[in-house]
Amino acid sequence: MANLIDNTARSAASDARAARHPEKQKRADTPVLRKPDWIRVKAPLGKTFSETQKIVKDGGLVTVCEEAGCPNIGECWEQKHATFMILGDTCTRACSFCNVKTGLPAAVDTDEPRRVAEAVAQMGLNHVVITSVDRDDLDDGGAQHFVDVIEAIRAATPSTTIEILTPDFLRKPGAAEAVIDARPDVFNHNLETVPRLYLSIRPGARYFHSLRLLERVKDRDPAQFTKSGIMVGLGESKEEVMQVMDDMRSAGIDFLTIGQYLQPTRKHAAVDRFVHPDEFKAYETIARAKGFLMVSATPLTRSSHHAGDDFAKLRAAREQMMARG
């Protein structure tokens, strides 16, 4: 086993050269907590990992696995699972928790839907997760591109189930509806944190707008599964987490994910504490009691981790619920 790759150890000179986060360079370094023993992952090695890496590279594609520094990349890529990040590698937002590059994005690549669909077919995916950067520069926030990708995958591999993890489409009238009408199997949009921390952690977003986005999915297509997640370890209280759960259930959200926040670099928000695995188990118990069909709550839980297996469980849970009447 190997510890997580620690990007926080990079020097200031290295950060400046990389310039992934130009808006963060003037921020003071934040303290870095030593990771506990329970946060351990396998090093990304093996033939299948390399094969997945080659498919992504040859297709000129971007994955959130790489861009966000996901700790589960070794496990997922060894199983030929990858989360494709469309609409480029540059985000128009500057959330203090996120490792994705920020700045002025390039023009939309209209050939990307074809290449994503081709990669899905090459990898033999039964379930695929598609996410994107925020594209506040586009009139529709990138909604039509999501639709194009969904349609391309359905044309190439009709049996593949599709999960999308979308931006909030803030101030983009009709954008969310266009994506909902493309009928992905799972519509995911992460609330990320509790309302009190939005200004410091997710300053470009609005908590109740994000919540309403997920509610609109259910209003427009009640059969569509909805999913959302939060990070813990940012300074939230247990009571605040439980209130978020209640808000999500009021919006009809089916699937909740809760994972430990991990600090990408010293210029990002600091970890307030590492939440013990027993606390995650308690959160899972509480969430299930509140009526979520599916809950994943562990230190290394991420939105797309085990997404295919979880989708099968989610669908089975709904069928059981309907059978009970």
UniProtKB/Swiss-Prot annotation:
- The residues that hold [4Fe-4S] cluster 1 are C65, C70, C76, S304
What is a single molecular function from GO for this protein? Answer: metal ion binding
State which Enzyme Commission number(s) the record gives.
Answer: 2.8.1.8
Region (Disordered) location: 1-31
Q: Name one Pfam family in it.
A: Radical_SAM
Residues annotated as binding [4Fe-4S] cluster 2 are C91, C95, C98
GO CC annotation terms, alphabetical:
cytoplasm
Localization terms from the record? Cytoplasm
CDD domains recorded: Radical_SAM
Name the keywords, alphabetized: 4Fe-4S, Cytoplasm, Iron, Iron-sulfur, Metal-binding, S-adenosyl-L-methionine, Transferase
User: In which residue ranges is the amino acid composition biased (Basic and acidic residues)?
Assistant: 17-31
What are the disulphide bonds in this sequence? none
Task: Please list the cofactors this protein needs.
Answer: [4Fe-4S] cluster
**SUPFAM superfamilies from the xrefs?**
Radical SAM enzymes (SSF102114)
Q: Where is the Radical SAM core domain?
A: 77-293
For this protein, the record's InterPro entries field holds: Aldolase_TIM (IPR013785), Elp3/MiaA/NifB-like_rSAM (IPR006638), LIAS_N (IPR031691), Lipoyl_synth (IPR003698), rSAM (IPR007197)
Alphabetized SMART domains for the sequence: Elp3
**Coiled coil segments of this chain:** none
Is S-adenosyl-L-methionine tagged as a keyword? yes
Q: How is the cofactor bound?
A: Binds 2 [4Fe-4S] clusters per subunit. One cluster is coordinated with 3 cysteines and an exchangeable S-adenosyl-L-methionine.
Question: What domain of life?
Answer: Bacteria
Q: Which pathway does the UniProt entry assign to this protein?
A: Protein modification; protein lipoylation via endogenous pathway; protein N(6)-(lipoyl)lysine from octanoyl-[acyl-carrier-protein]: step 2/2
| Catalytic reaction list | [[Fe-S] cluster scaffold protein carrying a second [4Fe-4S](2+) cluster] + N(6)-octanoyl-L-lysyl-[protein] + 2 oxidized [2Fe-2S]-[ferredoxin] + 2 S-adenosyl-L-methionine + 4 H(+) = [[Fe-S] cluster scaffold protein] + N(6)-[(R)-dihydrolipoyl]-L-lysyl-[protein] + 4 Fe(3+) + 2 hydrogen sulfide + 2 5'-deoxyadenosine + 2 L-methionine + 2 reduced [2Fe-2S]-[ferredoxin]
What is the similarity comment for this entry?
Answer: Belongs to the radical SAM superfamily. Lipoyl synthase family.
UniProt name for this protein: Lipoyl synthase
